[in-house]
Regions:
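Bacterial Sec-type N-terminal signal peptides, specifically the leucine/valine-rich hydrophobic h-region
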Residues: 17-20
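Exposed, flexible binding/inhibitory loops of compact, secreted disulfide-stabilized domains
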Residues: 7, 22-142
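Bacterial N-terminal signal peptides that target proteins for export
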Residues: 1-10
Length: 142
C-alpha cells in the first residue's frame, strides 16, 4: 500500500512539473510575439539632439548601442565602430513592439566587392539614429 501511495505521489509530482514547464514556455513565446511594427524616421546628423550627438562622438570608435529620450520621442542608436575606408550604410530590417520590449534589427552594408571607395587609408564610423514614439520598454538589439 505504501509503495502504491509513493508511486502515485511521484507520478502526480512529475505531471505537475511537466504541466508547469509547458505553460511557462507558452507564456514566453507570447511575450516575444510581435504586437505591431513601429513607425520611425532615420535622423540626419544635424537633427540629432546635442546631448546625444556628444555621446555618439565619444563612443564612435567602438561598436555601441544607445537609447535616448527627449520630448516624447525615443531615439535608438547603433554604431558599428571604426571601419576601413568608406561606402558603408546601415539597413533597418525591423523595428517592432512585443509585450515586454522593443526589437531593433539592423545590418551593416559594406561597399560591393571591387567597388572603389574614396580612400581605403582613412576610416569611417558608420552609425544610425532612428526616432520613434516614446514607449517605456527596453530595447533589444538583434
Amino acid at each position: 500500500m505504501k509503495l502504491l501511495l509513493r508511486s502515485l505521489t511521484c507520478v502526480l509530482c512529475l505531471f505537475g512539473v511537466l504541466t508547469l514547464t509547458a505553460c511557462s514556455k507558452e507564456n514566453r513565446q507570447d511575450s516575444l510575439a510581435k504586437i505591431k511594427n513601429l513607425e520611425f524616421t532615420v535622423i540626419s546628423e544635424d537633427c540629432i539632439p546635442d546631448e546625444l550627438r556628444k555621446v555618439i562622438l565619444e563612443k564612435k570608435d567602438s561598436p555601441f548601442k544607445i537609447t535616448y529620450t527627449d520630448n516624447g520621442f525615443l531615439y535608438i542608436c547603433i554604431g558599428y565602430g571604426e571601419q576601413p575606408g568608406g561606402g558603408f550604410s546601415i539597413a533597418v530590417n525591423e523595428l517592432y513592439l512585443t509585450e515586454n520590449a522593443i526589437y531593433f534589427d539592423t545590418t551593416l552594408l559594406g561597399p560591393e566587392p571591387g567597388e572603389e571607395t574614396a580612400n581605403r587609408e582613412t576610416s569611417s564610423y558608420p552609425y544610425l539614429v532612428v526616432k520613434t514614439e516614446f514607449i517605456d520598454e527596453p530595447v533589444v538589439y538583434k
